[in-house]
Swiss-Prot record:
InterPro entries with a match to the protein in the record: EF-hand-dom_pair, EF_Hand_1_Ca_BS, EF_hand_dom
GO BP, one annotated term: response to cation stress
Underlying gene: cnbA
Keyword Transit peptide listed: no
Gene source species: Dictyostelium discoideum
Protein name in UniProt: Calcineurin subunit B type 1
Binding residue positions for Ca(2+) 4: 148, 150, 152, 154, 159
């Protein structure tokens, strides 16, 4: 099965070039990396294959990141999904796209809002046992109160942008150099 995925055809390359900020040479390089990560040669990446990357394996939000990569929600990352997310996180990605990606990390149920419970879950992933649940809930409550401008009990994307969009260096913090 892995053989049928060994080459990108010209049409696929052109489509990905049109839909991303990557050149043909960059796409070919990314495809070679993708194939190296695809240990079983299936043409897709599984969570376990992502976890085999030492730098990513330690990331407490890796499961959420993988869920966002997996746009069609089939529990596998196809190359086009891989490219789409990497394009967002590359230095060529727009600030708005990067902030949408970050918002998606917190918006676990994909309803367009960050609820108190979702914020708690994501922060719990990040802090682990460094804070107890009461301390963490206090931070969550304070964040929701400060960021919920329309007072509906949740954070919309616009409110999220208002809260963090103007932080100095946010775009750089959400950029990864994939060309190395």
């Amino acid at each position: 099965m892995g053989n049928q995925h060994s080459l990108l055809n010209k049409e696929q390359l052109e489509q990905m070039k049109d839909n991303s900020s990557f050149s043909e040479a960059e796409l070919k390089k990314l495809y070679r990396r993708f194939q190296m990560l695809d240990k079983d040669g299936s043409g897709t990446l599984t969570t376990d294959e992502f976890l085999s990357i030492p730098d990513l394996a330690l990331n407490p939000l890796l499961e959420r990141v993988i869920q966002i990569f997996d746009q069609n929600k089939d529990n596998e990352i196809e190359f086009f999904e891989f490219v789409g997310t990497l394009a967002t996180l590359s230095h060529k990605g727009t600030k708005e796209d990067k902030l949408k990606f970050l918002f998606q990390i917190y918006d676990i149920d994909c309803d367009g809002f960050i609820s108190n419970g979702e914020l708690f879950q994501v922060l719990k992933m990040m802090v682990g046992t460094n804070l107890n649940d009461v301390q963490l809930q206090q931070i969550v409550d304070k964040t929701i109160i400060e960021g919920d401008y329309d007072k509906d009990g949740k954070i919309s994307f616009d409110e999220f942008i208002h809260m963090i969009g103007n932080q100095e260096g946010i775009e750089e913090k959400l950029s990864v150099n994939w060309s190395e």
